[in-house]
Amino acid sequence: MASCVGSRTLSKDDVNYKMHFRMINEQQVEDITIDFFYRPHTITLLSFTIVSLMYFAFTRDDSVPEDNIWRGILSVIFFFLIISVLAFPNGPFTRPHPALWRMVFGLSVLYFLFLVFLLFLNFEQVKSLMYWLDPNLRYATREADVMEYAVNCHVITWERIISHFDIFAFGHFWGWAMKALLIRSYGLCWTISITWELTELFFMHLLPNFAECWWDQVILDILLCNGGGIWLGMVVCRFLEMRTYHWASFKDIHTTTGKIKRAVLQFTPASWTYVRWFDPKSSFQRVAGVYLFMIIWQLTELNTFFLKHIFVFQASHPLSWGRILFIGGITAPTVRQYYAYLTDTQCKRVGTQCWVFGVIGFLEAIVCIKFGQDLFSKTQILYVVLWLLCVAFTTFLCLYGMIWYAEHYGHREKTYSECEDGTYSPEISWHHRKGTKGSEDSPPKHAGNNESHSSRRRNRHSKSKVTNGVGKK
């Protein structure tokens, strides 16, 4: 009787909720090409762990204390990643292998715990830790102390413009190409690019290196570096959207060239979701969610500059570019999970990677404020308030423009987005109308040209058991 009372049959809504959350948090691999790489190897990993620990415990020289600490930390990270492969969720991606994304999530958890640890240290202890990692940091200087910014802006020559195309300019270009691959929206990418330049203006009183000449901000940053990177990323997006992602298994490929091509394609997405951040029928909650996305994105970018300014290390130091690469790695599944949460009405919670990313962003900001109190004591509250209002106005203005363009000029094709009940399609809207063939309510003639394309998309998605735009592959 007690067991009957304690048990509860899951409703249809509960089943759908669990299914939708699992698809963004624990994506399954169904199109397995080589069985060996997807079989459980828990006993093998257990044996490897025990043997390797015994080897390092009894064979290595432990006479150097600093070497012991360093190797111990590396071993903890290594074996924590092994546990990540065994226990952590896959996330929304399965290519090139789910184990890779489990380790990415494991690294984000480690970084989160490291930031929590930093909160309980004082500034001298943090600097001692940095000097232990790299003794050369004792002699590091701030870029703002040795360089001048926004000087002689009225002098515009080709030599001066070309001199600004350094390694950082190429970093801007490729960085925005990757951001476009993640966001997949011209409007949102351009909004983030413009609002970041506004962010630099409002925080220029705290970080002098944010001061730039107008032609540097508008022409070099926004139009050339950022704009070129956005264009390249969106071109790659269109290329991936046109591709068919149901490749044959290695067993079905009989030529060496075909097998090599299939191996290379393993490092491309298993499925490509047509991203639609803004629907013409978007609710206020959707707009507010995009605004929150903008704020967190700007905060993460600001943390990059505040960290290297407060703890004094150059932009070329591994602590700087290593963090940027790491944040870029965990941003990919984060954006995917946040997009699913924002657009799928049946997804009631964010994914675990998205949750950890949000905590990391705010923890980095807290660390900067705690150890940079001398810097933040100069903060002009009015500038911060104006920045928030300006970002909100720019975001809402851009959203309105994108929605207006989508309603009047946007080319809408049938897609399988995150939210099935919010998917817009001219064919679906026509079928809901009342009318007969040949009447005014009949579909336009050009709709038939896309019929084969839409049917191919339906067949392709049905084979991979796609639900809400996430292919189980």
UniProtKB/Swiss-Prot annotation:
Activity-regulation annotation: Requires calcium ions. Inhibited by exogenous phosphatidylserine.
Main enzyme class: transferase
Catalyzed reactions: a 1,2-diacyl-sn-glycero-3-phosphoethanolamine + L-serine = a 1,2-diacyl-sn-glycero-3-phospho-L-serine + ethanolamine; a 1,2-diacyl-sn-glycero-3-phosphocholine + L-serine = a 1,2-diacyl-sn-glycero-3-phospho-L-serine + choline
Pfam families per UniProt: PSS
Biased composition range(s): Basic residues: 455-464
GO CC terms in record: endoplasmic reticulum membrane; membrane
Gene Ontology biological-process annotations: phosphatidylserine biosynthetic process
Stretches assigned to the Lumenal side: 57-72, 124-186, 238-286, 343-355, 405-473
Function as written in the Swiss-Prot or TrEMBL entry: Catalyzes a base-exchange reaction in which the polar head group of phosphatidylethanolamine (PE) or phosphatidylcholine (PC) is replaced by L-serine. Catalyzes mainly the conversion of phosphatidylcholine. Also converts, in vitro and to a lesser extent, phosphatidylethanolamine.
Protein name: Phosphatidylserine synthase 1
Gene name as annotated: PTDSS1
